Amino acid sequence: MASSSRSVLLLVAALFAVFLGSAHGIAKVPPGPNITATYGDEWLDAKSTWYGKPTGAGPKDNGGACGYKDVDKPPFSGMTGCGNTPIFKDGRGCGSCFEIKCTKPESCSGEPVTVHITDDNEEPIAPYHFDLSGHAFGSMAKKGEEQKLRSAGELELKFRRVKCKYPDGTKPTFHVEKGSNPNYLALLVKYIDGDGDVVAVDIKEKGKDKWIELKESWGAVWRVDTPDKLTGPFTVRYTTEGGTKGEAEDVIPEGWKADTAYEAK
């Protein structure tokens, strides 16, 4: 969307918020336009809060609405957060990456840091709202002033979408979810370089030509129900929001097991 169009939409959202605040006493700010993979490198305004432990990764179970596990550990390493509707996008924003920075209060470093979207938030406090892990929120501070910044509670920040760059050796990973069986397969897709988020997933059994389309289940989880037993090995094909396709050949082996993660070769 062009910059001028985005500005008009944000102005309308702000005016509508004022109306709601006058009518009901509480300003419920409508969300801004969706931030897509083709959005560009323009810095936008947002509000930021934080949740969980001060130096933690957010959720108590180190998970979140995307379905990822252990977001406190590499490669996410606690640099995570919840996005509101135009960022989380009903799960299609899971895995996307954003640079964020703050300049006020004085404890802000002004230097950008990168966060991954791993969770959802519904607080209508701004067109764009990042509810960050305590660790990610503190990372915007000058060295040694992390807790001072966290004590601010809520900040104005600048953000922009960027390509995800995982550490060397990180491979696309497909977690076969609990409850999967030969007639039902659910895959959690994670660690996708580039766009980070995924909009389509298909599988193909070894020796067959037909691709089987998976449907969105929730968060970053994709599923398929089939009357024919799925035995594997499977190649997984995924498409990112920007249209990039990737294939992980025979990544799900014959004799696959539920609640098990398989890395691309």
UniProtKB/Swiss-Prot annotation:
Q: Name one GO biological process term.
A: plant-type cell wall loosening
Q: Which SMART domains match?
A: DPBB_1
Q: Where in the sequence does glycosylation occur per the annotation? A: 34
Entry keywords, A to Z? Allergen, Glycoprotein, Secreted, Signal
The Expansin-like CBD domain, residue ranges: 183-264
Q: Would you indicate the residue range of the signal peptide?
A: 1-25
- InterPro entries cross-referenced by the UniProt entry: Expan_Lol_pI, Expansin/allergen_DPBB_dom, Expansin_CBD, Expansin_CBD_sf, LolPI, RlpA-like_DPBB, RlpA-like_sf
Under the heading Pfam families, the entry gives: DPBB_1, Expansin_C
Where, if anywhere, are coiled coils annotated?
Answer: none
> Mind naming one GO cellular-component term on file for this protein?
extracellular region
Q: Which CDD domains match?
A: DPBB_EXPB_N
PROSITE patterns noted in UniProt? EXPANSIN_CBD (PS50843), EXPANSIN_EG45 (PS50842)
* UniProt key word Signal: yes
Family, according to the entry, reads as follows: Belongs to the expansin family. Expansin B subfamily.
This one is known as Major pollen allergen Hol l 1
Can you name the source organism? Holcus lanatus
Lineage runs:
Eukaryota, Viridiplantae, Streptophyta, Embryophyta, Tracheophyta
